[in-house]
Design a protein with these regions (language model features):
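Terminal, non-globular segments
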Residues: 1-165
């Protein structure tokens, strides 16, 4: 890992947190919003490994919780778990290929499903109606929207064409 990667990751995370708090609510569709921070956590998990993805998920989730005023620890726990799960798909030799393929999208969708489920359960949102209702009314739409927002990452990495890591 070069000495410039960590500052770039930190700067990218800060910019994405700012965008997630200020601009993403503007593009919400019926209160469904994509989770750009989760896309970054999955990207880091697949690029640098499970440990790095887990730690980055925890740090990004904590900073987001502090900046957004959400229940402290709910986003941190959800993103930590999502980074951990996404890290299972890390393979040093195929990392660049996975990030450029539909597999990245599928991993983002899986991580978004886990992230949204854990976040809503921990934060206690709409749980009084039951998990199936929560799944259909919030978790699945947020997951689909997050997956849709991961497509530009795949297109960019394919367009760029050079080695990622």
């Amino acid at each position: 890992m070069s000495k410039f990667e960590i500052p770039v990751f930190i700067l990218t995370a800060v910019v994405l947190i700012f965008i997630q708090i200020t601009l993403v609510p503007i593009i919400s569709v019926n209160r469904y919003i994509p989770d750009l921070l989760l896309i970054m956590v999955v990207f880091l998990s697949l690029r640098k490994g499970q440990f790095f993805g887990t730690v980055s998920g925890g740090v990004i989730g904590l900073i987001y919780d502090l900046a957004s005023g959400n229940l402290l620890g709910s986003g941190m726990f959800a993103k930590t778990l999502s980074g951990f799960i996404a890290g299972y798909f890390y393979n040093e030799t195929t990392s660049s290929t996975v990030l450029r393929s539909y597999r990245f999208l599928l991993i983002v969708i899986l991580a978004a499903l886990i992230n949204s489920s854990v976040y809503h359960i921990v934060a206690g949102y709409e749980i009084s109606y039951g998990f199936v209702s929560l799944l259909l009314s919030s978790i699945i739409p947020d997951t689909i929207y997050t997956g849709f927002m991961a497509l530009p990452v795949i297109f960019y990495l394919n367009f760029r064409g050079e080695s990622i890591g």
